[in-house]
Amino acid sequence: EDIDVILVHGAGSFGHLKAKQYRLAEGHVEGATFDGPLTQDEAVTDVRNDMLALNEHVLNALTRLDISAVSLAPHQWARNTGPSFEGDLSLFRDAPKGIVVVTHGDVVDCDEPKRFGILSGDDLVVRLATELPGVNRLVFAMGGVEGVLSQPPGVSSEAYLIERLTENMFFEGEHAVEM
């Protein structure tokens, strides 16, 4: 079967730690001081570069498996954050057949006064899965974790660990980026 694949990977320690340290999810914080040598603007550049480095590792891993791939870093084509971010999703639709398109959560430019923010891979996935034609599967692959929580930690005492997801399983929750 001829299947087109879009791979959306997370940031892990390449992006999350510095983004949290410099409060990048909040956007520009006037007059804020940080426990580190960088300004917020310098941290934006650093996190973008760190994400490009991680993305290069992903592309190299695919290449070693003889999988052709191309990268679309969100800071190069998307603006604003959340599920209503602005960006040309046709870049994914129009990618050459047989090429895996790789993207990731990223620090993107935002309207004033925020100036920048975190566009999460979760928001990218929602838009790609619902707006691109012919999408019939969304697969989450995770490593090094015990499973998926039914709700974010601390939101509800009724949250439970889902050790194995199946196609007949349904749960509902809300996710927010806390960086």
Please describe what each predicted stretch is.
Residues E1-I6:
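N-terminal glycine-/serine-/threonine-rich phosphate-binding loop
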Residues V8-G12:
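Glycine-rich beta-strand-to-loop/alpha-helix junction loops that act as flexible
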Residues F14, K20-A32, G117-D123, V155-I162:
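A glycine- and small-aliphatic-rich helix-loop capping segment at beta-alpha/alpha-beta transitions
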Residues K20-V108:
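Ligand-binding beta-strand-loop-alpha-helix segment within the catalytic cores
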Residues L38-L59, G105-R127, S157-M179:
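Polyanion-binding loop/helix "lid" in catalytic or ligand-binding cores
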Residues E56-V58, P83-S150:
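Internal active-site segments that recognize and position negatively charged phosphoryl groups
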